[in-house]
Amino acid sequence: ITWSLVGSEMCIRDSPKVLSYVDVLRGNAQVGEKVAVIGAGGIGFDVSEFLAEHPREGEQPLPEWMKEWGVDMAGDTPGGLVKAAPEKPARQITLLQRKPTPLGKDLGKTSGWVHRATLKSRNVEMLKNCSYEKIDDAGLHIKIGEESRVLDVDNVILCAGQESLRELYKEDGKNFHLIGGADLAAELDAKRA
Protein backbone atom coordinates (compact mmCIF):
# COMPACT_ATOMS: atom_id res chain seq x y z
CA ILE A 1 0.00 0.00 0.00
CA THR A 2 1.29 3.45 -0.81
CA TRP A 3 -0.67 6.41 0.49
CA SER A 4 0.18 10.02 0.15
CA LEU A 5 -1.69 12.34 2.45
CA VAL A 6 -2.82 15.23 0.31
CA GLY A 7 -1.23 18.44 1.56
CA SER A 8 1.00 16.58 4.02
CA GLU A 9 4.71 16.08 4.08
CA MET A 10 4.42 12.40 4.98
CA CYS A 11 4.25 9.52 2.57
CA ILE A 12 3.62 6.09 4.07
CA ARG A 13 5.07 3.12 2.23
CA ASP A 14 4.32 -0.49 3.05
CA SER A 15 4.03 -0.04 6.82
CA PRO A 16 2.23 -3.03 8.34
CA LYS A 17 0.67 -0.64 10.87
CA VAL A 18 -1.14 1.38 8.19
CA LEU A 19 -4.63 0.30 7.17
CA SER A 20 -7.17 1.65 4.72
CA TYR A 21 -10.56 2.51 6.21
CA VAL A 22 -12.10 0.49 3.37
CA ASP A 23 -10.30 -2.68 4.48
CA VAL A 24 -11.24 -2.00 8.12
CA LEU A 25 -14.95 -1.52 7.39
CA ARG A 26 -15.08 -4.56 5.10
CA GLY A 27 -13.49 -6.73 7.79
CA ASN A 28 -10.40 -7.38 5.65
CA ALA A 29 -7.95 -6.04 8.24
CA GLN A 30 -7.03 -7.09 11.76
CA VAL A 31 -7.18 -3.95 13.94
CA GLY A 32 -5.21 -3.69 17.18
CA GLU A 33 -6.28 -2.33 20.56
CA LYS A 34 -4.61 1.10 20.16
CA VAL A 35 -5.50 2.99 17.00
CA ALA A 36 -4.79 6.38 15.42
CA VAL A 37 -7.34 7.56 12.85
CA ILE A 38 -5.95 10.19 10.46
CA GLY A 39 -8.71 12.41 9.10
CA ALA A 40 -11.54 13.84 11.16
CA GLY A 41 -14.15 14.28 8.46
CA GLY A 42 -17.31 12.22 8.25
CA ILE A 43 -15.42 9.04 7.37
CA GLY A 44 -12.95 9.49 10.24
CA PHE A 45 -15.78 9.99 12.73
CA ASP A 46 -17.69 6.97 11.41
CA VAL A 47 -14.61 4.73 11.46
CA SER A 48 -13.72 5.87 15.00
CA GLU A 49 -17.24 5.13 16.20
CA PHE A 50 -17.22 1.74 14.45
CA LEU A 51 -13.90 0.80 16.09
CA ALA A 52 -14.94 2.00 19.55
CA GLU A 53 -18.03 -0.23 19.62
CA HIS A 54 -17.95 -3.84 20.69
CA PRO A 55 -19.07 -6.26 17.96
CA ARG A 56 -22.64 -7.48 18.44
CA GLU A 57 -25.17 -9.49 16.52
CA GLY A 58 -27.95 -7.29 15.18
CA GLU A 59 -28.99 -3.91 16.52
CA GLN A 60 -28.26 -2.55 19.96
CA PRO A 61 -31.17 -3.42 22.28
CA LEU A 62 -33.26 -0.37 23.20
CA PRO A 63 -32.77 -0.67 27.00
CA GLU A 64 -28.99 -0.76 26.46
CA TRP A 65 -29.16 2.34 24.25
CA MET A 66 -31.34 4.18 26.80
CA LYS A 67 -28.84 3.38 29.57
CA GLU A 68 -25.93 4.52 27.41
CA TRP A 69 -27.56 7.91 26.75
CA GLY A 70 -29.01 8.37 30.25
CA VAL A 71 -32.71 8.02 29.46
CA ASP A 72 -34.88 7.07 32.45
CA MET A 73 -37.00 4.17 31.17
CA ALA A 74 -39.26 4.29 34.25
CA GLY A 75 -39.91 8.01 33.92
CA ASP A 76 -39.16 8.59 37.62
CA THR A 77 -36.79 11.54 37.20
CA PRO A 78 -37.55 15.13 36.22
CA GLY A 79 -36.96 15.49 32.50
CA GLY A 80 -36.63 11.72 32.14
CA LEU A 81 -32.84 11.82 32.33
CA VAL A 82 -30.38 10.00 34.57
CA LYS A 83 -26.59 9.78 34.51
CA ALA A 84 -25.45 8.26 31.23
CA ALA A 85 -23.65 4.92 31.48
CA PRO A 86 -21.81 4.31 28.22
CA GLU A 87 -20.12 0.97 27.70
CA LYS A 88 -16.35 0.75 27.95
CA PRO A 89 -14.82 1.37 24.51
CA ALA A 90 -13.53 -1.61 22.55
CA ARG A 91 -10.29 0.21 21.68
CA GLN A 92 -8.15 3.18 22.63
CA ILE A 93 -8.60 5.60 19.74
CA THR A 94 -6.96 8.89 18.82
CA LEU A 95 -8.65 10.90 16.05
CA LEU A 96 -6.36 13.42 14.33
CA GLN A 97 -6.69 16.24 11.83
CA ARG A 98 -4.32 18.78 10.31
CA LYS A 99 -6.75 21.69 10.49
CA PRO A 100 -6.64 23.97 13.56
CA THR A 101 -10.44 24.06 13.78
CA PRO A 102 -12.45 21.94 16.24
CA LEU A 103 -12.88 18.32 15.16
CA GLY A 104 -16.29 17.64 13.65
CA LYS A 105 -16.93 21.32 12.93
CA ASP A 106 -18.07 20.51 9.40
CA LEU A 107 -20.23 17.50 10.23
CA GLY A 108 -23.96 17.77 9.60
CA LYS A 109 -25.80 20.46 11.56
CA THR A 110 -28.44 18.04 12.84
CA SER A 111 -26.26 15.01 13.53
CA GLY A 112 -22.73 16.29 14.14
CA TRP A 113 -23.34 16.78 17.85
CA VAL A 114 -24.33 13.11 18.20
CA HIS A 115 -21.10 11.93 16.56
CA ARG A 116 -18.99 14.22 18.76
CA ALA A 117 -20.88 13.15 21.92
CA THR A 118 -20.56 9.46 21.03
CA LEU A 119 -16.80 9.69 20.55
CA LYS A 120 -16.45 11.72 23.75
CA SER A 121 -18.39 9.05 25.67
CA ARG A 122 -16.03 6.41 24.21
CA ASN A 123 -12.99 8.38 25.48
CA VAL A 124 -11.68 9.05 21.97
CA GLU A 125 -8.82 11.54 22.14
CA MET A 126 -9.34 14.24 19.50
CA LEU A 127 -6.29 16.17 18.33
CA LYS A 128 -6.26 19.12 15.93
CA ASN A 129 -3.51 21.11 14.25
CA CYS A 130 -1.39 17.97 13.78
CA SER A 131 1.42 17.36 11.38
CA TYR A 132 2.44 13.78 10.73
CA GLU A 133 6.15 13.02 10.92
CA LYS A 134 6.62 9.27 10.54
CA ILE A 135 5.44 5.81 11.56
CA ASP A 136 7.84 3.30 13.07
CA ASP A 137 7.92 0.57 15.73
CA ALA A 138 7.43 3.21 18.45
CA GLY A 139 4.20 4.42 16.83
CA LEU A 140 2.94 7.49 14.99
CA HIS A 141 5.20 10.52 15.39
CA ILE A 142 3.26 13.79 15.23
CA LYS A 143 3.66 17.46 16.03
CA ILE A 144 0.93 19.61 17.51
CA GLY A 145 2.15 23.12 16.95
CA GLU A 146 5.74 22.94 18.22
CA GLU A 147 5.14 19.99 20.58
CA SER A 148 6.40 16.61 19.37
CA ARG A 149 4.54 13.51 20.45
CA VAL A 150 4.68 9.79 19.73
CA LEU A 151 1.36 7.93 19.80
CA ASP A 152 1.92 4.32 20.85
CA VAL A 153 -0.48 2.65 18.42
CA ASP A 154 -0.90 -0.77 16.88
CA ASN A 155 -2.47 0.65 13.73
CA VAL A 156 -2.90 3.89 11.82
CA ILE A 157 -6.10 4.05 9.78
CA LEU A 158 -6.18 6.49 6.89
CA CYS A 159 -9.42 8.39 6.43
CA ALA A 160 -7.84 11.39 4.68
CA GLY A 161 -6.37 12.31 1.36
CA GLN A 162 -8.98 10.73 -0.89
CA GLU A 163 -8.88 11.86 -4.46
CA SER A 164 -11.48 11.23 -7.12
CA LEU A 165 -10.36 8.67 -9.69
CA ARG A 166 -11.98 9.35 -13.03
CA GLU A 167 -10.04 6.90 -15.23
CA LEU A 168 -12.91 4.44 -15.70
CA TYR A 169 -15.32 7.28 -16.43
CA LYS A 170 -13.02 8.62 -19.13
CA GLU A 171 -12.15 5.18 -20.56
CA ASP A 172 -15.77 4.02 -20.89
CA GLY A 173 -16.76 6.89 -23.16
CA LYS A 174 -20.40 6.71 -22.06
CA ASN A 175 -22.36 9.76 -20.98
CA PHE A 176 -22.54 9.55 -17.18
CA HIS A 177 -23.03 12.28 -14.61
CA LEU A 178 -20.44 12.30 -11.86
CA ILE A 179 -21.97 13.04 -8.47
CA GLY A 180 -21.00 12.80 -4.80
CA GLY A 181 -17.64 11.27 -3.97
CA ALA A 182 -17.08 10.17 -7.58
CA ASP A 183 -17.11 13.84 -8.59
CA LEU A 184 -15.24 15.32 -5.61
CA ALA A 185 -13.96 13.05 -2.83
CA ALA A 186 -12.91 15.85 -0.47
CA GLU A 187 -15.04 16.55 2.63
CA LEU A 188 -17.65 13.98 1.64
CA ASP A 189 -20.80 13.90 3.74
CA ALA A 190 -24.15 12.15 3.45
CA LYS A 191 -25.83 15.16 1.83
CA ARG A 192 -23.27 15.43 -0.98
CA ALA A 193 -22.69 11.68 -1.33
Locate predicted features.
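Residues within well-ordered alpha-helices
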Residues: 1, 115, 165-168
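N-terminal Rossmann-like dinucleotide/flavin-binding domain of flavoprotein oxidoreductases
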Residues: 104-130
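Short aromatic/basic micro-patch
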Residues: 4-5, 126, 150-152
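Residue-level signal for WD-repeat beta-propeller blades
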Residues: 4-5, 87, 134
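Single conserved hydrophobic/aromatic residue that forms the stacking wall/gate
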Residues: 1-7, 12
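A conserved short coil-to-beta-strand element within the FAD-binding core of flavoproteins
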Residues: 128-139
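Rossmann-like dinucleotide/flavin-binding elements
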Residues: 15-107, 142-193
